[in-house]
Regions:
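Active-site signature of alpha/beta-hydrolase-fold catalytic machinery across serine-
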Residues: 36, 117-121
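Short alpha-helix in the alpha/beta-hydrolase fold that links the catalytic acid
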Residues: 36-39, 158-168
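Alpha/beta-hydrolase fold nucleophile elbow
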Residues: 97-107
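Gly/Ala-rich beta-loop-alpha elbow adjacent to hydrolase catalytic centers
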Residues: 106-111, 115
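A conserved short beta-strand
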Residues: 123-134
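Short beta-strand/loop motif that positions the catalytic acidic residue
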Residues: 148-150, 154
Length: 204
């Protein structure tokens, strides 16, 4: 039975795309935020990629930007519901033409937490967490390749959050995990884009 899509999204691609990258923006941003990153990642890859950037469902309390769930204070029950809806949406994108195993899921900050929680329950080609953190009681299950990145000067989400993710993945004996730290703040370092591109070519 076909899953239901719960999210609006922006799509950039061609009818002959064979692979897909799905982007999950951070707290207070919108679906357009990561599009430049997505374009840089797929530029001149050996496979034709479609970019899909999902829009978080809720507006922040002040009406500026969107959120996957409330963070101030954090509503972890709302997060669980949001993860469930994201899983449905990701399954909706699991098509015969572009299955999830030919899909990269990339999230930034709150979007990274969502990508890890939802993505590691599915048979994805690659999950990428940028400046992410683990949800409470998160236990990774599906053993797909994972890339982690974090800025050492990040004062929004501390680097220790990604180190905790790595610890949990190693505890579950994940075989294909890469962790990278950069001399930057709460952002996606330009050098990490090259790391992602190399990993995509290696996997696909």
């Amino acid at each position: 039975m076909k899953s239901f899509i719960h999210h609006e999204y922006v799509s950039i691609g061609h009818h002959n795309s064979t692979h897909r990258i799905i982007l999950l923006h951070g707290w207070g941003a919108d679906s357009d935020d990561l599009l430049p990153i997505g374009k840089s990642i797929i530029h001149n890859l050996s496979h034709e990629f479609e970019i899909v950037s999902l829009k978080a469902p809720d507006f922040r309390a002040n009406g500026v930007g969107r959120q996957w769930y409330s963070l101030f204070p954090p509503d972890w029950n709302e997060a669980k519901i949001s993860v469930g809806k994201l899983i449905d949406t990701l399954k909706w994108f699991d098509t015969q033409k572009i299955p999830l195993r030919d899909t990269v899921l990339l999230g930034f900050s709150q979007g990274a937490a969502m990508a890890l929680d939802a993505g590691l329950r599915l048979d994805l080609g690659l999950v990428v967490s940028c400046s992410g953190y683990p949800h409470p009681e998160w236990i990774p299950s599906e053993n797909c390749p994972v890339l982690l990145s974090h800025g050492l000067q990040d004062d929004i989400v501390p680097p220790s959050a990604s180190r905790e993710i790595l610890k949990k993945l190693k505890h579950k004996k994940y075989l294909n995990v890469g962790s990278h730290e950069f001399n930057c703040a709460h952002t996606i370092h330009e050098n990490f884009i090259d790391v992602i591109r190399i990993k995509i070519e290696e996997i696909f």
